[in-house]
C-alpha cells in the first residue's frame, strides 16, 4: 500500500518554532511530529510513503531518510516548485500513487490521533466507492465544514456545509483519507483544493463515504492546539502504553513523559500533562504543568511554567513565571524573576522585563 503526507509550507501558525525546524520535524511527544504518522502507516502495511514538501526539503530528506530501514518503508520526497494546495500534490506524485491499482492514504501532517489505517482500509474496500474521508465529531460544528450524509445509504456523503448557522451535524473532515488511484484523474496539475474541488465531484458521483474516528483527534498546527493535542496524546498513552510515562515521586497528576537523559531535581513538581525532551534540566522546586520542554532547555530553581512551549536550548530563570500559551523559540533566555504571559518569542532573544499580555517579541 501507499501513503502521501501533505507536509506543506512554512508552518507560520507554529512560529517561532518553525523558524528553526520545518513543522513536521518539531518534536511532539518527544519524537518528530511526522514520525508518528510514518510509524502508523508502516504498521498498517504501507510500504511506499510520499512526502509532499515545498519548504526546506533538504532538511526533511537528511532527517527522515534514516527511518526507511527502521520502519521498512520507501520514503519519496515530492518537492513542489510552487505551493500546490491539498490536491495538486497528489497529481505531482501520480507516478508513485498510480504504480498499481491499490488505494492510497492521504493525510495532513498537522493531524494527531489514533490513526485507524487498517480499519479504514477494510471499510473502504467493503463499500467499493472511490474515496473515504475520516470524520471526527466536534462540540462546535459551526466553526467547521460539516459532513452531511445521504438519508438512505449509511456513511455515503450527500454534501458539505461550510460553517453552518443551524445544526446539520457534528462530523467534520479529520484530514485523513483513502482514495482509489482513479481520483487522481480528476485533479489538474495546478494549485488546487481536494476539499473544495475534488471531493464535491466525488459527492456528485456518489463515490465518497465517511468513516467515523474513535478516540482523540487534534490539528496541532498552532501553539494552543499543540498543547491541547499533547494532553490528548498523553491521556491516550496512559491507557495504551502506561509504561512509557514517568512514575517518579516528583510527578504530580500523571501524564508526564520524560526523556531518560533529562535531569529533574527531586524537589521539582511536574505535571499533569508535561513532555520533557532530551538533556533538559529542571531545577530545585520548579513547578511545571501542561507544558512541553524541548531538547537542551533549562527551567531553573523555583520557576513556575504553565501552558508553555520551551524551545530548544532556551532557559527560564530562577523564580520566573511563564503561562498563557507562551512559546519560546530556539535559544531564548527568560531572566530571573521575570513574568511572561502569552508571548511568542523569536529565537536568540533575552527577556529582561515582564510581558503581561499577549505579544510577539522580535
From Swiss-Prot:
GO terms for molecular function: GTP binding; mannose-1-phosphate guanylyltransferase (GTP) activity. Keywords: Cell cycle, Cytoplasm, GTP-binding, Nucleotide-binding, Nucleotidyltransferase, Transferase. It is an enzyme of class 2 (transferase). Pathway: Nucleotide-sugar biosynthesis; GDP-alpha-D-mannose biosynthesis; GDP-alpha-D-mannose from alpha-D-mannose 1-phosphate (GTP route): step 1/1. The keyword Cell cycle applies. Its EC number is 2.7.7.13. CDD domains: M1P_guanylylT_B_like_N. One of its GO terms (biological process) is protein glycosylation. It catalyses: alpha-D-mannose 1-phosphate + GTP + H(+) = GDP-alpha-D-mannose + diphosphate. It is found in: Cytoplasm. Belongs to the transferase hexapeptide repeat family. This is Mannose-1-phosphate guanyltransferase. It comes from Candida albicans (strain SC5314 / ATCC MYA-2876).
Amino acid at each position: 500500500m501507499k501513503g502521501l503526507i501533505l507536509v506543506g509550507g512554512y508552518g507560520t501558525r507554529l512560529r517561532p518554532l518553525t523558524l528553526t525546524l520545518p513543522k513536521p520535524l518539531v518534536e511532539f511527544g518527544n519524537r518528530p511530529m511526522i514520525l508518528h504518522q510514518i510509524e502508523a502507516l508502516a504498521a498498517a502495511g504501507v510500504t511506499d510513503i510520499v512526502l509532499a514538501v515545498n519548504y526546506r526539503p533538504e532538511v526533511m530528506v537528511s532527517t527522515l531518510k534514516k527511518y526507511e530501514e527502521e520502519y521498512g518503508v520507501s520514503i519519496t520526497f515530492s518537492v513542489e516548485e510552487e505551493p500546490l494546495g491539498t490536491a495538486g500534490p497528489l497529481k505531482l506524485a501520480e507516478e508513485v500513487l498510480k504504480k498499481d491499482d491499490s488505494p492510497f492514504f492521504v493525510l495532513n501532517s498537522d493531524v494527531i490521533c489514533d490513526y485507524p489505517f487498517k480499519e479504514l482500509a477494510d471499510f473502504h474496500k467493503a463499500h467499493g466507492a472511490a474515496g473515504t474521508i475520516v470524520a471526527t465529531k466536534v462540540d462546535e460544528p459551526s466553526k467547521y465544514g460539516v459532513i452531511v450524509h445521504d438519508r438512505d445509504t449509511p456513511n455515503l456523503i450527500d454534501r458539505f456545509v461550510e460553517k453552518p448557522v443551524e445544526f446539520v451535524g457534528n462530523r467534520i473532515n479529520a484530514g485523513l483519507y483513502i482514495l482509489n488511484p482513479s481520483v487522481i484523474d480528476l485533479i489538474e496539475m495546478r494549485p488546487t483544493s481536494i476539499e473544495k474541488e475534488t471531493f464535491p465531484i466525488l459527492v456528485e458521483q456518489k463515490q465518497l463515504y465517511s468513516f467515523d474516528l474513535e478516540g482523540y483527534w487534534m490539528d496541532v498546527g498552532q501553539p494552543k492546539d499543540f498543547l491541547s493535542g499533547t494532553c490528548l496524546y498523553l491521556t491516550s498513552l496512559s491507557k495504551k502504553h502506561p509504561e512509557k510515562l514517568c512514575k517518579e515521586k516528583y510527578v504530580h497528576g500523571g501524564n508526564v513523559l520524560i526523556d531518560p537523559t533529562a535531569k529533574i531535581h527531586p524537589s521539582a513538581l511536574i505535571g499533569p500533562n508535561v513532555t520533557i525532551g532530551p538533556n533538559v534540566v529542571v531545577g530545585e522546586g520548579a513547578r511545571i504543568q501542561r507544558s512541553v520542554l524541548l531538547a537542551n532547555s533549562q527551567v531553573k530553581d523555583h520557576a513556575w511554567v504553565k501552558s508553555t512551549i520551551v524551545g530548544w536550548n532556551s532557559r527560564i530563570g530562577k523564580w520566573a513565571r511563564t503561562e498563557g500559551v507562551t512559546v519560546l523559540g530556539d535559544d531564548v533566555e527568560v531572566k530571573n524573576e521575570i513574568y511572561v504571559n502569552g508571548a511568542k518569542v523569536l529565537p536568540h532573544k533575552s527577556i529582561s522585563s515582564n510581558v503581561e499580555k499577549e505579544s510577539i517579541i522580535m
